[in-house]
From Swiss-Prot:
Pfam family, one: UIM
GO biological process: protein targeting to vacuole; protein transport to vacuole involved in ubiquitin-dependent protein catabolic process via the multivesicular body sorting pathway
Stated name of the protein: Vacuolar protein sorting-associated protein 27
Residues the entry annotates as binding Zn(2+): 174, 177, 198, 201
InterPro entries: ENTH_VHS (IPR008942), HGS/VPS27 (IPR017073), UIM_dom (IPR003903), VHS_dom (IPR002014), Vps27_GAT-like (IPR049425), Znf_FYVE (IPR000306), Znf_FYVE-rel (IPR017455), Znf_FYVE_PHD (IPR011011)
PROSITE patterns: UIM, VHS, ZF_FYVE
C-alpha cells in the first residue's frame, strides 16, 4: 500500500488539515472527510499523526483548538490503526510537554482545558485495551501531579470502534476459484475483505463508504454481491459480462442461492396456476361457462355441435343449483361466525375470573425495584457513612417499596398457605403409598400361603423356597451322626449319598457282615423316615473288611426325586466302600428290623399315610439296623417325598441294640432342630468314589399328593 502514496498525497492532506484548522469556524464536513481519508488508509496513519502534532504546536490558540477537535474526530472515526498512533509516546508526550511548558510559551487556558478533556475522554474509552494503555498512564500521571480535569463523563469503549479496511492477506492461489497465480495470472486484493483473488474473480469495482472509501475500488465477486444486496435490499442476478477462464465447482457454489430459489419457486407457482386454469377450463359441466369461453373453444371435428345443445339446455338448471349451494354456504358461514363470536365473547367474559390474584401479586416492575433496592443497600454497606443521604434515588426507592409492604405480606401469606397445602398433600400421598405397599405385601403373603398349603406346608409364616419340590418338615430322630466339620447336623448338600464310616459316630451293633439276601426285609417304607435319609447305610458301618463281601459295582446315589432336610447329610471320613445290591435296595425302601418279613409295596404306600396317627418319640435304637436284604427296586411311587411332616415310629423290640451303641445326648439334640431349615432344594452331591450318578436312576416325577387315608392302622406294624 505504500506505493500508492507519495509526497503529493501528503501535501494534499496537509492542505486539507490547514483548511480544517484555520482560525475560522469549524468545518465539520471537512473534518469527516479527513477522517475518512485516514480510515481508508489513503494516507499512512503515522503521517497523519505527525501532521496533526505539527498543527497543534501552532501559536494561534484558535488553530490549536480546531486541531484538537479535528484530532478527536479522527480518533472516533479513523479506525484502530490511527488510534494506535495517537496512543503512542510521540503524540502523548507532545501533549504533556505543552501542558508543562513554562508560562512564557505555555498555551492558552482554554487549550489546556481542551487537552485535559480529550486525554480524560480517550483514557476512559481506552480502558481494558492493552494496545492503548499509554493513554491511561499519562492520565494517571497528570492526576498525581495535580492537574484539574473537568467532570468525568461516562464514555463507552465502542466510541473508538470504527470500520477500517482490513489488512491484506497473501496466498499462492485464488481464494475463490483456487487457481494458482502465475506470471500472467496476477494477484489482486479485495479492498473490502483484504483477501487475494485472481483477475477474473475480482473484476468488480464499487465504492466502500462504510470504510471511508468514496471512489470505486476493486472488490471480489462475493463482496460485490453482498454489498449490492445490502444497498438495494433485494437479490440481484449475477452479471456475466466478464469472461472467466476457470469456472470451477467452488466458484459456482459461491453464487447467491436466493435468486435461484426465488426463480424456481416462481416457475413452480406459475405452472401450478396454469394447470389449475386448464383444469377449470376443461371441466365444462362443473359450473357456469361464459359465452366467451364457449366461443373460444374449438369445435370438435366429429358430430358437429350435437353435444352443445344439451349443455345449453342444462345451463339454467346448473346455474340454479350453484346459486342454491352458494346460498347454503353463505348461511353456514354466518352460523360459524356467530358461534365463533359467541365463543370468543364467552372466553373473554370468563377471562377476568382467573385474574383476581393480581391484586396482591407483585408486578415485574415492583419485583425489580425490590431487587434493585436490596442491591443498593448491599453496596452502601461498604461505602463511607452519609452516602445514603446524598442519593435521592435510594430514598425514592425506599418510599415506593414501603408502600408494597402490605402486598408483600399478603403474597408471603398466600405462599405459606400454598406451602402448607403442599405438605398436607404430600403427607396424604405418602400414607396412601404406604397403605398400598402394605396391601401388596398382604396379597403376596396370602399368595405364598396358598402355594404352601397346596404343597402341604404346615407353617403359615414360612415362605416357600424357590425349588421344584415341596419341603418335608419332620422331627429328626436322635442319635444321628455328627457333622464332620462342626459337630452339628450338616447344613450343606443334604442329599449326598451316605458313606460307610463316620467320625465320632456310634459303631456297628455287632460289627458283623451284612446279611445274605435270604434274610427278611424291613417292613417300613422309606417315606416314613424323611428325617433320616439313609437309615440302612448310615447306622451300620462295619469295617472295610466286611464291605469286601458285597459287590463293588452297586455304589449308587439316591433317587433324584427324594428330598430330605438339610440336617441329615452324612459326610464321609473314610473312603467309600462298595455296597451290595441289598444295601442299594434298602437305600430306597429302608430296613429297620432284622428278622421281619418284607411288606408288599402297596402296603408300604398305604401304611405311609397312616403314620401321623402312630407317631412316637424317636429313640437312638431305631438307627441300628440289620444288614439289608436283596430286594428288587420298586416303582418311584414308593419314593415319593412330598408328604407332610412324618416321624419315625417306635421300633419293635427286635430292633433293640446293645447299650454300647447308644449315641450321646448331644447327638439327639442335633437332630431336633427347627423345620424351617429343611426347605432346601434337592441338589445331589457327586460321589467321591466311582459309581452310579444321578443319571442312572429315573428322573423326579411331578407327583401330586396322594390322598391320605385317615385312621388306617396296619395291624402287622402294631403287632411287631
Amino acid at each position: 500500500m505504500a506505493g500508492w502514496f507519495g509526497s503529493s498525497t501528503n501535501s494534499a492532506f496537509d492542505e486539507q488539515i490547514e483548511r480544517a484548522t484555520s482560525s475560522s469556524l469549524e468545518d465539520m464536513p471537512l473534518n469527516l472527510e479527513i477522517s475518512d481519508v485516514i480510515r481508508s488508509k489513503t494516507v499512512q496513519p503515522k503521517d497523519a499523526m505527525k501532521s496533526l502534532k505539527k498543527r497543534i504546536g501552532h501559536k494561534n490558540p484558535n488553530v490549536q483548538l480546531a486541531t484538537l477537535n479535528l484530532t478527536d474526530t479522527c480518533v472516533k472515526n479513523g479506525g484502530a490503526h490511527f488510534i494506535q498512533e495517537i496512543a503512542s509516546r510521540e503524540f502523548m508526550d507532545n501533549l504533556t510537554s505543552l501542558l508543562k511548558a513554562p508560562s512564557t510559551i505555555a498555551p492558552n487556558n482554554d487549550v489546556k482545558n481542551k487537552m485535559l478533556e480529550l486525554i480524560q475522554s480517550w483514557a476512559t474509552a481506552a480502558e481494558g485495551r492493552m494496545n492503548l494503555g499509554y493513554i491511561n498512564e499519562v492520565y494517571r500521571s497528570l492526576q498525581r501531579e495535580g492537574y484539574h480535569f473537568p467532570p468525568k463523563e461516562n464514555i463507552a469503549s465502542s466510541m473508538l470502534d470504527s470500520s477500517a479496511p482490513p489488512e491484506w492477506t497473501d496466498s499462492d492461489v485464488c481464494m475463490r476459484c483456487r487457481t494458482a497465480f502465475t506470471f500472467t495470472n496476477r494477484k489482486h486484493h479485495c479492498r473490502n475483505c483484504g483477501n487475494v483473488f485472481c483477475g477474473a474473480c475480482s473484476s468488480k469495482t464499487i465504492p466502500l463508504p462504510h470504510l471511508g472509501i468514496m471512489e470505486p475500488v476493486r472488490v471480489d465477486d462475493g463482496c460485490h454481491e453482498k454489498l449490492t444486496i445490502r444497498s438495494r435490499g433485494a437479490p440481484v442476478p449475477r452479471p456475466f459480462d466478464t469472461p472467466k477462464p476457470h469456472k470451477t465447482l467452488y466458484q459456482g457454489a459461491m453464487e447467491p442461492r436466493s435468486a435461484r430459489v426465488d426463480d424456481s419457486f416462481d416457475a413452480d407457482l406459475k405452472r401450478a396456476l396454469e394447470m389449475s386454469l386448464e383444469d377449470a377450463k376443461g371441466t365444462g359441466s362443473s359450473g357456469f361457462v361464459s359465452q366467451s369461453q364457449l366461443q373460444s373453444k374449438p369445435k370438435p371435428s366429429t358430430n358437429g355441435s350435437s353435444r352443445k345443445e344439451p349443455q345449453e339446455e342444462e345451463d339454467p338448471d346448473l346455474a340454479a343449483a350453484i346459486a342454491a349451494s352458494l346460498a347454503d354456504m353463505e348461511e353456514q358461514k354466518k352460523k360459524y361466525t356467530t358461534t365463533f363470536k359467541q365463543q370468543t365473547a364467552s372466553s373473554s367474559a370468563a377471562a377476568p375470573f382467573v385474574a383476581p390474584k393480581n391484586d396482591y401479586e407483585l408486578t415485574p416492575v415492583e419485583a425489580e425495584n425490590i431487587n434493585l433496592f436490596s442491591t443498593l443497600v448491599d453496596r452502601l454497606q461498604h461505602q463511607p457513612p452519609g452516602t445514603i443521604l446524598r442519593e435521592p434515588q435510594i430514598q425514592e426507592l425506599y418510599e415506593s417499596i414501603g408502600k408494597l409492604r402490605p402486598k408483600l405480606a399478603r403474597t408471603y401469606g398466600e405462599t405459606m398457605s400454598k406451602h402448607d397445602t403442599l405438605l398436607d398433600l404430600h403427607a396424604k400421598l405418602s400414607s396412601v403409598v404406604r397403605y398400598y405397599d402394605r396391601m401388596l405385601e398382604e396379597r403376596l403373603s396370602s399368595t405364598y400361603n396358598q402355594a404352601g398349603a397346596m404343597y402341604g406346608l404346615p407353617a403359615p409364616t414360612q415362605r416357600p423356597a424357590s425349588n421344584l419340590y415341596p419341603s418335608i418338615q419332620s422331627g429328626a430322630p436322635s442319635g444321628a451322626g455328627e457333622n464332620y466339620y462342626t459337630g452339628n447336623a450338616s447344613q450343606s448338600d443334604p442329599y449326598g449319598r451316605p458313606q460307610s464310616h463316620y467320625a465320632g459316630g456310634y459303631q456297628s451293633t455287632s460289627q458283623q457282615p451284612y446279611r445274605t439276601p435270604g434274610q427278611s426285609q424291613e417292613q417300613y417304607p422309606p417315606a416314613q423316615q424323611p428325617s433320616q435319609p439313609y437309615p440302612n447305610l448310615s447306622q451300620q458301618a462295619p469295617p472295610s473288611s466286611n464291605y469286601q463281601q458285597s459287590s463293588p459295582q452297586l455304589q449308587r446315589q439316591e433317587a433324584p426325586n427324594q428330598q430330605y432336610p438339610p440336617q441329615q447329610a452324612y459326610p464321609s471320613q473314610a473312603p467309600p466302600s462298595t455296597v451290595s445290591d441289598a444295601e442299594s435296595a434298602n437305600y430306597y425302601y429302608g430296613d429297620n428290623t432284622q428278622g421281619q418279613p418284607s411288606q408288599p409295596p402297596m402296603q408300604r404306600s398305604q401304611s405311609f399315610a397312616s403314620q401321623p396317627a402312630q407317631q412316637q418319640p424317636p429313640s437312638p435304637q431305631m438307627y441300628n439296623h440289620a444288614p439289608p436284604q436283596q430286594t428288587p427296586l420298586s416303582p418311584p411311587a414308593y419314593q415319593n417325598p412330598s408328604y407332610p411332616s412324618q416321624q419315625q415310629t417306635a421300633p419293635p423290640p427286635q430292633q433293640q441294640a446293645p447299650p454300647q451303641q447308644a449315641p450321646p445326648p448331644p447327638q439327639q439334640q442335633q437332630w431336633q432342630q427347627p423345620a424351617q431349615t429343611q426347605t432346601q432344594a434337592w441338589q445331589p452331591a457327586p460321589y467321591a468314589a466311582g459309581g452310579y450318578g444321578p443319571e442312572s436312576f429315573p428322573s423326579a416325577p411331578q407327583n401330586q399328593l396322594p390322598p391320605q387315608q385317615q385312621k388306617v392302622v396296619d395291624e402287622p406294624l402294631i403287632d411287631l
